[in-house]
């Protein structure tokens, strides 16, 4: 049964990569883009996916640096206020018109929900942002099959994001 679930997930992932590749061949062949091409949108879900509301949260120009080890993302010239984050919204990371990956939520230290997918975590005590694979970011949750599958599905697009930051010298180890 697990094999079928993984196979189905792989097929869905392959189709999403393939559809982006047709639209932006150069982007995925070189795995590089300009930092100015990165855009991150709040996506407020509606009942119809075609009517979702997109509003710009920040761009690549607002990314000061990203630490691959800690997953901290330093934003400059912008402060994301968790109180103003639209309810039931996600964060979609894009390069040009092609979606890279989606953060399932914007969470803070005071959230009590568990998220088994990528989140933008804001540490209100240290005033820092992180792109974590789950929330809370513990080994017990991170090692679950669901979280590991989502990490695997995001790998190709995550590498494009990392390589773009690396080319712009905005990557820290």
Regions found by a protein language model. Give the residues of each.
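Sec-dependent bacterial lipoprotein signal peptides
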Residues: 1-18
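Extracytoplasmic
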Residues: 27-122, 136-153
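C-terminal partner/receptor-binding element of secreted or periplasmic proteins
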Residues: 122-173
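Bacterial Sec-dependent N-terminal signal peptides
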Residues: 15-30
